[in-house]
Curated annotation (Swiss-Prot):
It comes from Angiopteris evecta (Mule's foot fern). This is Small ribosomal subunit protein uS4c. GO terms for molecular function: rRNA binding; structural constituent of ribosome. The keyword Ribonucleoprotein applies. Keywords: Chloroplast, Plastid, Ribonucleoprotein, Ribosomal protein, RNA-binding, rRNA-binding. The lineage of its organism: Eukaryota, Viridiplantae, Streptophyta, Embryophyta, Tracheophyta. One of its GO terms (cellular component) is small ribosomal subunit. Belongs to the universal ribosomal protein uS4 family. Pfam families: Ribosomal_S4, S4. Residues 91-159 form the S4 RNA-binding domain. GO terms for biological process: ribosomal small subunit biogenesis; translation. HAMAP family: Ribosomal_uS4_B. Part of the 30S ribosomal subunit. Contacts protein S5. The interaction surface between S4 and S5 is involved in control of translational fidelity.
Length: 206
């Protein structure tokens, strides 16, 4: 299953806010009433688990196969499968760029990486799924177009919104740079999600 490329507001109406996918929100009262009415209807446990899975998948811009791969990796790791799953997704390079404010959305961050604008520890990385580690330094290529792209995104940055596992700074030459302090904790996850529902969805399909 490929990545979703349709209208993003349609997804928000169905799955509620997806900050990684879009910074748009439903502002009209009619749309909000429709969501509230649908939420009040009795739905099956399967549909609840499916919605949680879809929220996680669409927020991070993953295909079904990619998300299933992460679930399997998390299942083999020590600790809570759900929390490990969220950590794996949060520590992806495209998500780190988004959480640092270097891009407005995760799809936009993916393009920055694919177009070779991003460095990790002063080395060019063009793989959005690259797994960042503590002490990694995220920076932008020393090229005019790369710097302009990221600095434009940073104009609306609220540093108070940067999670505790990351640090953002501007160097003396005003070049943006991010630092990974540690592995993300559950409290700093960027999406309101019940990860256990996602794990249950896949465990019942296995």
């Amino acid at each position: 299953m490929s990545r979703y490329r349709g209208p993003r507001l349609r997804l928000i109406r169905r799955l509620k806010d997806l900050p990684g996918l879009t910074n748009k929100t439903l502002k009209s009262k009619k749309a909000q009433i429709a969501i509230d009415q649908s939420a009040s209807k009795k739905i099956s446990q399967y549909c609840i688990r499916l919605e949680a899975k879809q929220r996680l998948r669409f927020n991070h811009g993953l295909t079904e196969r990619q998300l299933l791969k992460y679930v399997r990796i998390a299942g083999k790791a020590k600790g809570s499968t759900g929390q490990v799953l969220l950590q794996l997704l949060e520590m992806r390079l495209d998500n780190i760029l988004f959480r640092l404010g270097m891009s407005p959305t995760i799809p936009a961050a993916r393009q920055l990486v694919n177009h070779r604008h991003i460095l990790v520890n002063n080395r060019l990385v063009d793989i959005p799924s690259y797994r960042c580690k503590p002490k990694d330094i995220i920076s932008v290529r020393d090229q005019t177009n790369s710097q302009i792209l990221v600095k434009k995104n940073l104009e609306s940055l609220n540093k108070d919104q940067i999670p505790e596992h990351l640090t953002f700074s501007s160097l003396e030459d005003n070049k943006p740079q991010g630092f990974v302090n540690r592995i993300v904790t559950r409290d700093s996850i960027g999406l309101d999600i019940n990860e256990l529902l996602v794990v249950e969805y896949y465990s019942r399909k296995a």
